[in-house]
Amino acid sequence: MLIKPQSTSSFPLNWDAIFPEKNPLAVEIGFGNGKFLKTLETTGTNVVGFEVSLLSVEKAMKVIDHTKTALLLMDGIWGLRELFSERSVDALYINFPLPWPHKKHASRRLFTLPKLQIYASRLVDNAILQLQTDVKEYAEEAIRNSEESGLFSLADYAVRNEVQVGTKYEQKWVSQGKKIYKVVLRKKRHVSVPNYLDKEVIMPHAIVHDSHGTLKAGTYRTTFGTIKLWEPFSNNQAMLLIPAIVSDDDFIGVSLQQRVYISVSPHREGFIVKLDNHADVFKTENVKSLIWLIANQISNGNIKRINVQPPSKLEYEPA
């Protein structure tokens, strides 16, 4: 099954209500061709897979058991933190992640301390966190960081040169004569990591007296991240459709980037500024900032009613 949590009314998700049978919960971050998901299905667990590639999601949808596996098209670190309660995941798997070898990209690696804290917070006590990689240095760094964090201990470390599961990258690296390094970590200590998203979702919107103000396209840096705003589209019904890309950069080198469309349309009290009806996005703090920004500009500050707060920081760079 394909899950679109952007439209849900509360976080984290109730996974027991999503799956038809109540089983232990396993999560894979970056499932590629879906072969490892199929392996997990045979273990009697409910499986959740995260992937940022639409093509990978489409391929996996054709092979998974839709009663046992749920797929999400989104960043797995963000999803693990926002969609799961603390101590709710029984096992976490990361297969052949990008190693990000350059020092300037170190924060993007998946075994930094802030990310390890997220893993430890969502995993049940004594659960396993498993990594497979073809990069020895990456495996060693994962072990070192995990043990130094005090959150995980090393349960197993194995090296092989044959295909076991048949994932795309496993087959590729083995065919090139590379070794595969398998690291199994066990949760040692719990740590609490709060969600970024509000537990109860509100639909951000504003009512303005008029919409004749000037909308300034460009890049805005707010308290919560970055907003890239483009010129609006308009029609003869006095409606505006305003495209933007919104990034919430709240933590650990991973930002949630969303393509957002804001509509401005006539309302009995003037005009209403809100997410377009077809906008399938998380209502993050920076999406709320976007609503305030547009409402403030098109009304020349004459906002009649709004259910979000202005960002405490707002810097503008023209397009």
Swiss-Prot record:
Transmembrane segments: none
Keyword Methyltransferase among UniProt keywords: yes
UniProt organism field: Coprothermobacter proteolyticus (strain ATCC 35245 / DSM 5265 / OCM 4 / BT)
Pfam family, one: Methyltransf_4
Protein purpose: Catalyzes the formation of N(7)-methylguanine at position 46 (m7G46) in tRNA.
Gene: trmB
Domain of life where this protein originates: Bacteria
Residues bound to substrate: D134, T167, K168, Y169, E170
PANTHER family: 3-DEOXY-D-MANNO-OCTULOSONIC-ACID TRANSFERASE/TRNA GUANINE-N 7 - -METHYLTRANSFERASE (PTHR23417), PENTACOTRIPEPTIDE-REPEAT REGION OF PRORP DOMAIN-CONTAINING PROTEIN (PTHR23417:SF14)
InterPro entries on file: SAM-dependent_MTases_sf (IPR029063), tRNA_(Gua-N-7)_MeTrfase_Trmb (IPR003358), tRNA_methyltr_TrmB_bact (IPR055361)
Cell membrane listed as a keyword: no
Enzyme Commission number, as recorded: 2.1.1.33
Pathway(s) annotated for this protein in UniProt: tRNA modification; N(7)-methylguanine-tRNA biosynthesis
Gene Ontology cellular component annotations, sorted alphabetically: tRNA methyltransferase complex
Listed GO MF terms: tRNA (guanine(46)-N7)-methyltransferase activity
Protein name: tRNA (guanine-N(7)-)-methyltransferase
Primary enzyme class: transferase
UniProt entry keywords in alphabetical sequence: Methyltransferase, S-adenosyl-L-methionine, Transferase, tRNA processing
Annotated S-adenosyl-L-methionine binding sites: E28, E51, D75
Disulfide links within the chain: none
Family: Belongs to the class I-like SAM-binding methyltransferase superfamily. TrmB family.
